[in-house]
């Protein structure tokens, strides 16, 4: 028996010829939705023109390929025929890959935070045909949850407001757009005068503030969800090494007769505090479930404050920054609580993971689907790096979060034998019920391993790694993002130098060369442009984004492949001194319907316009937390 047509269920038929238009898109995230019954369109003028011609609002859905909750909402709602038919009848639906269009993501994240008080992915935004937002949220479940309406309830309320209270909807969209525009700074940030030393008191104050926010019990800062604070750790390590080059010499020699490097007691105190905070966080993360103890690499964040339940996607930008932080800790010399040798092992394993799991060889494209299982060592032929590994693994046709990484006590005993299996389960905090799900727990010691524990782990680790390679693997998003790749180039170059591994420097050089050959667009009559993404060796989309332009040349210069400004190409030059000062957050040629994200207007206005249009309140969630 055929499924009834939309008109049979009281929906108007969508316009003739309307269909899902994502199959030919290069973005892996967009192609994940190409089989949905929703008539998705890529972001662009044509989709907005279609909404204007039909006199319907736009449903804008923004996410990324590795996002677990994006997969959940896709399965629950976008694969559902009833939900799709309602969307097709009453909206023009647009899909955006936030990693390809961070400018679009930033505009509508500002609106989403203003309206709902939360942000995350999947992002669900309702727009006028001219692109102005009037309602927004993140994940919507198929059935109502406490404090959160169902997706169908939201669609029906938006459609009812559009048809019955159009004037209020348009007025509120205008209020939001003007509020966001008014919250923007009058001009781009510009620092007057030449760069100089930072004020020592300001740096010491920052260390003190971080000390007040530190989670001393578990390492890191703040509570759950907890993200690895790479930039904060970089600052703390640098401050521990040299608190400030503007700090005045001590008035008198140190009473203990030690060489203080010209620092006074306050400088020494904050330097010590910075070192201790960084060491506690680095140790906690590397011994936790956030870090893949078998293959290396860090998950994007932990759902819990103690780092024990990771959100399993692995992002290039996170791992590039964390690799460099661990390398810099090694260079600093470590502490007795977190020795440099232990950090060097984490750094080496992470560098190997970057090349083995995210590495892309020249002129090849693996078959669509999961990434190849990790090899025993890095691929020395890597010329570029993929952007991420998925949080989910598809097992028997079903998305299961973290399934590749989970173990049970019984599974360990079957693989290693009763004695070793039980010992590893105890050492690595594997129990039933699992810490993540009924499927088990990720391996993590939670403390420094030494003596017999370290010997046991070194003995069984190859066997465990081999067994895991034979499991289904998470998918890989193979687009190359220039800015993230630049971060990885810098990290690999530093790792190669500090860890005495020249093959990592060689890999950094090859990847830097790829960025120059594929992503850089020189211009004879002015500054060139760095294209943000490439697929299969072809750069596409937009260029000139602030998140891309500083990172890639910095990484290439660090790799020693392109020191400073190379003669003849001028490749990094436009990024160091923007004309008229400052930097732009979006591409000059980007077609945006809104303002770049800076800050959000007060939520009171959002509450008022939700009331005036009788839309469901977009309350902050209790669970789940969007990606």
Describe the function of each predicted region:
Residues 1-491, 495-498:
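Replace the tail clause
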Residues 322-325, 491, 552-555, 623-626:
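Active-site-proximal alpha-helical segments within enzyme catalytic domains
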Residues 359, 524-528, 532, 540-549, ...:
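Long, polar/charge-rich, low-hydrophobicity segments
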Residues 483-486, 491-568:
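Long, K/E/R/D-enriched contiguous segments that form extended
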């Amino acid at each position: 028996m055929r499924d009834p047509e939309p008109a049979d269920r009281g929906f108007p038929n969508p316009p003739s010829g309307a269909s899902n238009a994502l199959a030919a898109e290069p973005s892996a995230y967009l192609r994940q939705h190409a089989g949905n019954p929703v008539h998705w369109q890529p972001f662009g003028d044509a989709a907005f023109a279609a909404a204007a011609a039909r006199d319907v609002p736009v449903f804008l859905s923004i996410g990324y390929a590795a996002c677990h909750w994006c997969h959940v909402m896709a399965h629950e709602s976008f694969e559902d025929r009833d939900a799709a038919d309602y969307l097709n009848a009453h909206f023009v639906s647009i899909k955006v890959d936030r990693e390809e269009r961070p400018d679009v993501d930033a505009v509508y994240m500002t609106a989403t935070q203003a309206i709902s008080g939360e942000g995350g992915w999947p992002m669900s935004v309702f727009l006028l045909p001219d692109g102005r937002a009037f309602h927004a949220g993140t994940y919507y479940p198929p059935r109502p949850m406490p404090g959160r309406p169902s997706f169908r309830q939201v669609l029906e309320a938006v459609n009812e407001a559009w048809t019955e209270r159009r004037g209020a909807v348009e007025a509120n969209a205008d209020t939001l757009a003007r509020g966001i525009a008014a919250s923007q700074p009058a001009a781009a940030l510009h620092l007057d005068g030449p760069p100089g030393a930072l004020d020592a008191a300001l740096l010491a104050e920052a260390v003190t503030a971080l000390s007040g926010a530190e989670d001393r019990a578990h390492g890191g800062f703040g509570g759950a969800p907890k993200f690895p604070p790479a930039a904060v750790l970089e600052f703390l390590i640098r401050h521990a090494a040299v608190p400030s080059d503007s700090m005045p010499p001590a008035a008198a020699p140190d009473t203990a007769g030690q060489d203080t490097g010209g620092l006074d007691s306050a400088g020494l105190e904050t330097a010590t505090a910075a070192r201790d905070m960084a060491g506690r966080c680095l140790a906690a993360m590397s011994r936790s479930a956030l870090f893949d103890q078998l293959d290396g690499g860090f998950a994007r964040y932990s759902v819990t404050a103690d780092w024990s339940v990771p959100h399993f996607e692995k992002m290039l930008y996170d791992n590039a920054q964390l690799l460099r932080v661990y390398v810099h800790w090694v260079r600093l010399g470590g502490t007795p609580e977190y020795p440099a040798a232990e950090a060097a092992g984490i750094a080496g394993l992470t560098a190997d993971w970057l090349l083995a799991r995210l590495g892309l060889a020249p002129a090849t494209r693996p078959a669509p689907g999961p990434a190849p299982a990790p090899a025993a060592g890095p691929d020395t032929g890597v010329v570029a790096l993929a952007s991420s590994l998925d949080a989910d693994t598809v097992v028997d046709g079903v998305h299961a979060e973290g399934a590749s990484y989970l173990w049970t006590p019984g599974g360990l005993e079957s693989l290693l034998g009763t004695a070793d299996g039980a010992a590893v389960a105890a050492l690595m905090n594997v129990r039933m019920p699992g810490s993540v799900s009924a499927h088990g727990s990720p391996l993590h010691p939670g403390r420094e391993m030494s003596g017999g524990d370290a010997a046991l782990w070194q003995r069984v680790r190859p066997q465990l790694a081999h067994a895991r390679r034979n499991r289904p693997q998470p998918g890989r998003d193979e687009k190359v993002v220039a800015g993230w790749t630049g971060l990885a180039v810098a990290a690999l170059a530093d790792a190669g130098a500090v860890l005495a591994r020249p093959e990592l420097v060689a890999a950094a050089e090859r990847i830097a060369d790829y960025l120059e050959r594929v992503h850089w667009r020189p211009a004879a009559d002015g500054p060139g442009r760095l294209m943000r993404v490439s697929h299969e060796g072809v750069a596409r989309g937009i260029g000139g984004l602030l998140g891309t332009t500083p990172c890639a040349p910095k990484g290439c210069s660090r790799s020693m492949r392109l020191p400073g400004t190379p003669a003849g190409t001028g490749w990094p030059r436009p990024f160091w001194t923007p004309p008229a000062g400052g930097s732009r957050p979006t591409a000059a040629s980007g077609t945006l319907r809104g303002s770049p994200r800076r800050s959000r207007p007060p939520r009171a206005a959002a509450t008022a316009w939700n009331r005036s249009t009788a839309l469901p309140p977009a309350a902050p969630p209790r669970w789940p937390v969007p990606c």
